[in-house]
Curated annotation (Swiss-Prot):
Molecular function as annotated in GO: NADH dehydrogenase (ubiquinone) activity; ubiquinone binding
Function: Core subunit of the mitochondrial membrane respiratory chain NADH dehydrogenase (Complex I) that is believed to belong to the minimal assembly required for catalysis. Complex I functions in the transfer of electrons from NADH to the respiratory chain. The immediate electron acceptor for the enzyme is believed to be ubiquinone.
Entry's localization field: Mitochondrion membrane
InterPro entries: NADH_UbQ_OxRdtase, ND/Mrp_TM
Presence of keyword Coiled coil: no
Name listed for the protein in its UniProt record: NADH-ubiquinone oxidoreductase chain 4
Parts of the chain that traverse the membrane: 8-28, 50-70, 78-98, 100-120, 132-152, 177-197, 212-232, 239-259, 266-286, 297-317, 324-344, 361-381, 417-437
Organism: Albinaria caerulea (Land snail)
Domain of life: Eukaryota
GO process annotations (BP): ATP synthesis coupled electron transport; electron transport coupled proton transport
Sorted UniProt keywords: Electron transport, Membrane, Mitochondrion, NAD, Respiratory chain, Translocase, Transmembrane, Transmembrane helix, Transport, Ubiquinone
Enzyme Commission number, as recorded: 7.1.1.2
C-alpha cells in the first residue's frame, strides 16, 4: 500500500493526462490484490493501516478518478489534472492512516481541490455561492471535532485508533457525542445538514460531481465508522437514537423532494442525501448486519451516483438543458443511452441482483430489532426510492420528443466504456471478506 501512495504522489508531480492515465492503469490492478484479504483490521506499517472497507474505498477512489479522466478526456489542462491527482492522493491517504489527527488533516485538505474544481471549472456565476456553502458547512461542523481530538490527545497522550480504544472510556456526554459526529454527518450528509450538496453538484463540472458523489461523501461515512468503533463504541446514548430517527425521516423527506425536482442534477444530488442517510443510520445502529449494510451501500452508491451524473451530463449535451421539462423522448434517438439510463435507474432503486439491493436488504433485520417504526420508515424510503428512480427514467427517455433537442451524433465509444466501467464493479465486488466486520 505504501507503494500505491508513492505512485499516487508521483501523479501530482507530473500532472499530464497521459502520465496520469498510465499511472492509474498500473495502480488499479495493484489495489485489487488488497481487496480479497481475510482480516478485519491489520497494520501494514507504523503509518499505513488497512481495513477491508478502507481498501474497498481506495479502489473506489482510484476507479472514479480514472473514469473522471476518461469521461472528461477533452479537458487536458494540467491544472485540472493536478486538482484531480492531488484529491486522489489525499483520499487514498485518508482511507489508510492509523490515527485521528492525520485523518482529520486529510479530511480537511480534501476540501481545497474540491473547491478549486467548482470555482475554476464550474459553469455559472452561482458557483461562488456553492463554494461558500461547501466551506461554511464543512469547516464549521469540523471545528468541534478538532477541539475534541485535542482533548483526547491531552487525556490519552495519543490519537492512534487502537490506543484510544484501549485507554479511553467514553462517558456518553451528549454534547461530546454531537461534537464528534457533526463533521461526518455534514459530510455524508444527512437531511438538515445537506444544503451545500445540491448547490455544489449543480454548479460543479462533470468531474467534480463524479468525485464528490462517488468518493467524497464516503469520507464522512468512513470517519463515522471509525469514530463509532474506536471512541464511542457501543454507546447507548439517547443522542444516537435521535440521530438514527432523524436520518431515516430525512431520507423520507429527501426522497419526496426528488420527485418534485425539475433539474436532473439536483434530483441525483437529493437521491444521494437519501441513500447516505441510510448509511449513517446503519453505522449508528452498531450491529454486524447494519455495519455490513452501510459498507455495501457506500460502495454501491459510489459507482451508481457517479454514473448517473455521467448520464445527466450526456443528456445535457444533447438537449442543452438540465430541465426535465425539456429532457424527454431520448429513447427514440439514443436507444443505447436509454438502456444505460434503465440499468442505473434500477441500481439506484436497489433492484436485484446488484450490490445496492443486498446493502438495503441487510438493514431490514437491524431495523426490525431496533424498532418496528424504523422498519416502517425503511419500507417507505425503499418505495419512494423506486418511485423517483422510475420517474427519472420515464421522464428522460419516454414521452414525446422534446422540441429543444439539438442535432447531434450518437454517443462515442468512450462514453459507453465509462458507463460500462461503472456498471461492472457493482457485480464483481460481491466478495464476503470485503464487507466483514
Amino acid at each position: 500500500m505504501t507503494y500505491l501512495i508513492l505512485l499516487g504522489a508521483s501523479i501530482c508531480l507530473f500532472p499530464f493526462w497521459e502520465v496520469t492515465m498510465l499511472t492509474l492503469a498500473f495502480i488499479i490492478p495493484m489495489s485489487l490484490t488488497y481487496l480479497n484479504i481475510n482480516f478485519t483490521f491489520s497494520f501494514s506499517s507504523e503509518l499505513i493501516w488497512l481495513t477491508p472497507i478502507g481498501t474497498a474505498l481506495i479502489f473506489l477512489t482510484l476507479m472514479v478518478t480514472l473514469l473522471v479522466l476518461i469521461g472528461t478526456y477533452n479537458i487536458k489542462n494540467y491544472k485540472y489534472i493536478g486538482c484531480l491527482s492531488s484529491l486522489n492522493l489525499v483520499l487514498m491517504m485518508a482511507f489508510c492512516v492509523c490515527d485521528f489527527l492525520t485523518f482529520y488533516v486529510m479530511f480537511e485538505v480534501s476540501l481545497i481541490p474540491t473547491l478549486l474544481l467548482i470555482l475554476l471549472w464550474g459553469y455559472q456565476p452561482e458557483r461562488m455561492q456553492a463554494g461558500f456553502y461547501l466551506m461554511l458547512y464543512t469547516v464549521t461542523a469540523s471545528l468541534p471535532l478538532l477541539l475534541l481530538l485535542l482533548y483526547l490527545y491531552y487525556t490519552v497522550g495519543s490519537l492512534n485508533f487502537y490506543i484510544i480504544m484501549v485507554y479511553y472510556s467514553f462517558n456518553n456526554n451528549p454534547l461530546m457525542l454531537v461534537g464528534l459526529m457533526m463533521a461526518f454527518l455534514v459530510k455524508l450528509p444527512i437531511y438538515t445538514c445537506h444544503l451545500w450538496l445540491p448547490k455544489a453538484h449543480v454548479e460543479a463540472p462533470l468531474g467534480g460531481s463524479m468525485v464528490l458523489a462517488g468518493v467524497l461523501l464516503k469520507l464522512g461515512g468512513y470517519g463515522l465508522y471509525m469514530l463509532i468503533n474506536f471512541i464511542i463504541s457501543k454507546s447507548s446514548s439517547l443522542v444516537i437514537s435521535v440521530i438514527i430517527t432523524l436520518s431515516l425521516w430525512g431520507a423520507v423527506i429527501a426522497s419526496i423532494i426528488c420527485i418534485q425536482q425539475v433539474d436532473i442534477k439536483a434530483l441525483v444530488a437529493y437521491s444521494s442525501v437519501a441513500h447516505m442517510s441510510l448509511v449513517s443510520a446503519g453505522i449508528l445502529m452498531m450491529s454486524n448486519w447494519s455495519y455490513t449494510c452501510a459498507k455495501m451501500t457506500m460502495i454501491a452508491h459510489g459507482y451508481t451516483s457517479s454514473a448517473l451524473f455521467v448520464l445527466a451530463n450526456l443528456s445535457y449535451l444533447k438537449i442543452k438543458s438540465r430541465s426535465l421539462m425539456f429532457m424527454k423522448g431520448l429513447l427514440a434517438i439514443f436507444p443505447a443511452m436509454a438502456f444505460y439510463w434503465f440499468l442505473f435507474s434500477c441500481m439506484n432503486m436497489a433492484a436485484p441482483p446488484t450490490l445496492n439491493f443486498i446493502g438495503e436488504l441487510l438493514i431490514i433485520p437491524s431495523m426490525y430489532i431496533a424498532s418496528y417504526m424504523l422498519l416502517i420508515l425503511m419500507c417507505i424510503i425503499m418505495f419512494i426510492s423506486a418511485g423517483y428512480s422510475l420517474y427519472m427514467y420515464m421522464t428522460v427517455n419516454h414521452g414525446e420528443l422534446g422540441l429543444y433537442i439539438t442535432p447531434s451524433i450518437q454517443l462515442k465509444n468512450v462514453d459507453y466504456h465509462v458507463l460500462t466501467a461503472h456498471l461492472l464493479p457493482t457485480f464483481i465486488l460481491l466478495i464476503p471478506q470485503l464487507f466483514s466486520v
